[in-house]
Amino acid sequence: MAEAFSNSLSRATGIVTTSSSGTIGVYANHLSGISTVGISTGDIVDNTNYLAGTKVTGFGATAGTVTVDRVSTNSAEATSQIVSFLGVTSCYTSPAATKSILISGTFANNTENSVNLSIEILDSSGPTAALLASKIPVPHGSSFVISDTGKTLLEAGDVVRVYCDSDNAIDVNLSILTGVS
C-alpha cells in the first residue's frame, strides 16, 4: 500500500455525565451513592480524589455503585462529591493491515468557556490504552495542537480517542500518514 496523507475530522466531541452525591471511601476503587444512568465502562472519572485517567471498569452489585481501575487518593471518606464521567469519542482508527502515523492534531474549543481535554491511544493488540495528553486546558476561542515534533505510530486497529469535560465542546482535526511500512 502506498503512503498517503489524510485528515480525520470529528465535530463537537465531549460526552459528560455528572453526579453530585458521590461517596468515595478511603483508598477505594469504587464510588457509591450516584446515579449510573449514562455512565459506561471505559468512561474517565473526573474528580480530585482520583488520578487523571482513572476509568470505570464496571458496576457494583449494589445499586448506585461504580468500580474503577485505580484506588482513590483521599485519606478520609469523602461524601457529597461532584463526580463527572467523561465519555469517549473515537476520532480515528488505523485501517486493518495498515500502520499509520499521527503527524499532528488540532483540538479547537467551540464553547464560551474553558474546557479540559484528554487524548488517548487504544492499542488494538491488547486492552491497553495510554493517555497522550491529560486534562489539557483549552481556553475559549483557542485550541490545543499536537505538533509534528513528536509523532505517534498507530498499528492496525489502534484508535485515537478523545475525552472532554464539557458536552460537544471540542472539534478535532487529525493529520494522519497511512500505509507506513
What are the residue ranges of the model-derived segments?
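Intrinsically disordered, low-complexity Pro/Gly/Ser/Thr-rich segments with frequent PxxP/GP/PP motifs
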Residues: 125-159
